[in-house]
Amino acid sequence: MPSQFNDNFVATDDDVGTMARVGMALDRELNGDSFQDNLNFQPRSGKREDFEPFFQDTPNTKSLSKHFHDFTMNASLETLPSVEKPRGRNMNAFEETSWNRFRKNGSLFPLSSPPISEPDLRPQALNETPDYRNRFLGAFKKQGVLDDHGNLKLDASPSFLKKPAEYTPLANRQNQNLAFDSPTEALPPKPTTPWRRNGFRSKTTPNLNSGKETPSSYKASARLMEQLGLNHSEPSVDFNNQTSYRLPNLTNLSSLIRDDTIDENGNAKEHDRLPELNTIPVASTDEQLFNAHQLLEKKFEILKRERNECNAKIDELQDKLELLTDAYNREKRRARSLEERMSKEMLTKLGESNVDDGMAASRYDTVKREKERLSEHLKSLQEQYEHIQSVYKNVLLDRESYIMRLGNKISENNELLNENRVLKEKLQTYLDKKESNVTSKIKSTAENSSKPLSMNEADERKDGLNNLLFENKSGANTKEMSNGTETAKENCSPQQDSTSPTSGYQDLVKELAKEIEMRKSLELKLKLSQSNKAGPVKHRKRRPKSKRRITGKVVFDSPNVASGVESDEGSEEISLDSEYSDILSDDGDFEKEKQATLPRRRSSSSMKGNKLAEDSYLNEAGFDWNQGTFHNGSEFGTTGVPDEPNEEELPKHVLKQVEHIINESAAHGVGKCNACHARQEDLIRGEQKVSHSNCLYADQTLRPSQPPSEALKTVVNQLTNELMELKKRYEKLSDRYNSLTPGYHKHKRQEIKNKLIKLIECMESKSDQIYLLYDVNVGKDFS
């Protein structure tokens, strides 16, 4: 059987010992002097304090104040245990304040320290404390240093109750070494025996794994937390002085896109004089790039000459400045020598006794006047010297500005050269692709022609060839129209001449165009045959009674409707006038239809032979763009007005592309258009000849009456003239605005400002229209 007692067992009553320790701690707390320092007391060395680990590491367990609050609740002072009553020697001057504090706070240990993680509460905890708490902290100020064992050297009993060690009982002598600083220290663990339970507490205090013992005072614990680095203080970050990084401008694009009228925030700058609005030509073709390059080279040479002239002027001014400085130094030396000589003469003459006073005075006056004259001459030389220096500085500044401008022009020239090189490469690749596509199409057509044809296909091929022969006959007029364009093509840059296709390439293109037209005619004939097989439509909408077909012409009831509109188009295509304005704003959807090139001119006989009319497009005036062009035996259009000699005509391929853009950008299809569908049915059934009393025939103006390039030129010239007029008016208003004094005429300045803003808006709209027309003219090359 194991022994009932072990070595660590203490043969005392646990409950009695615990209550004794609690009573002594309560005595010191109620006296109020428990935190005074006793300098006479010296702890004994070599002996461990009996109750040293008392109140140790109990932040998560029940404190003594909780225990005392529990068993003293709902009890009067007379019914309290004797341990808690102040009796005997405890009746002193601190009794009243101690019990008043007990009654107010409801706890024996009201001293609570703020959390260490909040450093802002430390000065408040130290400054706003009562007298007993100041005494409590004063002990740590005097003797708050950790010793070798990590304990605080504190005295727990008042000084006036101290007795010599030999007269003090053993129990009191042992209790003098206790340091009951705060109720947060833990009780010692109780021995666990099988026949008795733990006294006073149901649970043992958990032992925290800490390197040092937790000190009882707030100040010492805060210092310990700072030493251990557990104060949770975040590093201070200066958000006001953050380092900003700005990337360098490596592309130099900002100098090309920069607008001087707008600041960094996107607001318009306010100056005394509003900026001038000059249009910048956009170099979008090789010819324009070549011209821009030549202009830049000329400007570069002009700037070089100006720089050389400035250098020569600077050298001349430097030589002149050196001469003036030499003259100034000579005059200065001469004036000094004259002053010295005059002073010597005056001294010698005044020393002589036989000197005539009148002659000396007159000579003195002459010398004084000479001195004043020389001083004035010296001042004039100084002013001249300063003027020459200012001129020299201005010349140096001009030279620096010329150098900067020259550098900017050189950089722009290099960028244009690079852009020109890239465009050349793109053009070469485009031509190679075009040649490959043409050869592939020619091969495919040759293969198709080598195959045997059926009877229907042979008939269709014959009809297509007949139509093609008629178109070749009617195409003689188009050659006259393209004379001016061929002359303009010969005047192009040598770069374009070097990239022009050969004669064999042109023949291949012509053959391909013929093959496409033939296929188009075959497709139309096939559609016609299918519609004949299907038979007439039963439920067809009746056409308006006001329009009747009279041998291919339309009769209108009112004379206001008479215009250049054909009867085949009807009122459905007149509604397309609103779509004509979209041609200038949109770049054109060039892939709405798969057929890129359509036959542009068909005679009346070919239309009757095919019994199907092509779809056309009406412009703003209601005229058809797809009708043939007839020049009446002249080399100009129907207007009869020759081209201006100063303006350059667009080449032939440009005109074709413009016409293609105009035809393709119209949202119109033969299968979807009601008017064209009705026209096809009428052609199938046959024309109805109806007479009408008020017979007004429409003027059959053939379209295009002039080349599209000429029309574009006239519109652009009109818009540029309007823009120039607006600019002149803007300059007049700006001069008037600048003539007004800022001290007066506020209302006038406001009125002129509003007019200037409206003029700027008008000029912007005109410039946008010109820009869109240039897009129409240039965008056809990429279709």
From Swiss-Prot:
Residues with the Phosphoserine modification: S157
Cellular component GO terms held in the UniProt record: central plaque of mitotic spindle pole body; cytoplasm; mitotic spindle pole body
Top-level taxon in the UniProt lineage: Eukaryota
Compositionally biased tracts (Basic residues): 536-551
Acidic residues composition-biased segments: 566-590
Cited InterPro entries: Centrosomal_MT-associated, Cep57_MT-bd_dom, PPC89_CLD
Keywords: Cytoplasm, Cytoskeleton, Meiosis, Phosphoprotein
Predominant place of localization: cytoplasm
Cell location: Cytoplasm; Cytoplasm, Cytoskeleton, Microtubule organizing center, Spindle pole body
Region: Disordered, residue numbers: 180-216, 434-458, 471-504, 528-610
Segments of skewed composition (Polar residues): 201-216, 437-453, 474-504
Single biological process term from Gene Ontology: meiotic cell cycle
Pfam families, per database record: Cep57_CLD_2 (PF14197), Cep57_MT_bd (PF06657)
GO terms assigned for molecular function: microtubule binding; spindle pole body anchor activity
Entry function: Has a role in meiosis.
Protein name: Spindle pole body protein ppc89
Name of encoding gene: ppc89
